[in-house]
């Protein structure tokens, strides 16, 4: 019987030089539009009070001055709760909530994705269903739980609910399903490794882009969170709440409010830049593996 020979042709996708230039120009324009609000916020924080209310408004400060930052620190230091206390509360909420959520979400995601046990699919469907509910809907239930554990009016009342967010669990589970191969885990189990060791030393490095993305998202959300229904004492309020009080001061506090906005914006940007570079580096190195 004669054999039919088939010839395989490689399909090479290529763009013209004009197409590359057009895409580059479009990305540059979009990047400039995304960067302009940050530049404007910094410019506003450096303007003296008379320039803040100048008409027509200027984009850049004509006579830049750091007095707004000085006024901000003086204002916060003369308040009943010092400036450092608001910053400390925000850092504790952001760091504690982020890393606690990362630990629990990745551990539960590993169990749902790579350990076979009865009810795993039902649990994951429950996680998927919970994504449809806004936090406002569950606020009363969360308040009752926090009250039962005597966590009302403490930082734990904000940190612990952040641990229970199901979005990070869903993200980590999906990444582990596609990027962590069962053959690698089975080899580790045959070598006598425990599940907790496999999760930490094998699974977590394989999904590094996922948990770095989770850190960025969770940290920014907690850092920018304002007043909470679980906290009513002034000494446990966050920095975002303090900014709201400064902004409510009106025209005379406009400069200090602009300076506070820059400080509030700076930390998430730094976290994003550091984590984003690690994400790109990790994805680039993982793409070179066989």
Identify the residue ranges that each predicted region occupies.
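A hydrophobic, multi-pass inner-membrane permease signature
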Residues: 2-290
């Amino acid at each position: 019987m004669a054999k039919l020979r088939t010839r395989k042709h490689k399909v090479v996708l290529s763009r013209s030089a004009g197409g590359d230039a057009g895409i580059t120009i479009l990305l540059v324009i979009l990047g400039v539009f995304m960067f302009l609000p940050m530049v404007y916020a910094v410019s506003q924080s450096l303007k003296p009070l008379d320039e803040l209310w100048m008409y027509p408004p200027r984009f850049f400060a004509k006579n830049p001055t750091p007095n707004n930052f000085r006024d901000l620190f003086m204002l916060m230091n003369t308040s009943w709760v010092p400036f450092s206390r608001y910053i400390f509360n925000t850092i504790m909420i952001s760091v504690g909530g982020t890393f606690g959520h990362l630990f629990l979400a990745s551990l539960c995601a590993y169990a749902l994705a790579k350990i076979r046990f009865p009810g795993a699919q039902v649990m994951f469907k429950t996680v998927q269903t919970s994504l449809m509910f806004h936090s406002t809907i569950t606020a009363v239930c969360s308040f009752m739980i926090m009250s039962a554990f005597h966590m009302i009016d403490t930082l734990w009342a904000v940190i612990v609910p952040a641990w229970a967010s199901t979005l990070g669990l869903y993200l980590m589970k999906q990444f582990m399903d596609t990027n962590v191969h069962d053959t690698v885990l089975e080899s580790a189990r045959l070598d006598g490794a425990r599940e907790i060791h496999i999760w930490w030393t094998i699974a977590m490095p394989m999904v590094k882009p996922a948990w770095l993305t989770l850190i960025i998202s969770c940290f920014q959300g907690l850092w920018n969170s304002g007043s909470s229904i679980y906290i009513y004492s002034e000494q446990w309020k966050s920095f975002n709440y303090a900014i709201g009080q400064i902004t409510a001061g009106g025209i005379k506090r406009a400069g200090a409010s602009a300076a506070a906005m820059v400080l509030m914006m700076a930390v998430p940007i730094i976290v994003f830049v550091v984590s984003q570079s690690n994400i790109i580096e990790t994805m680039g190195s993982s793409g070179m593996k066989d």
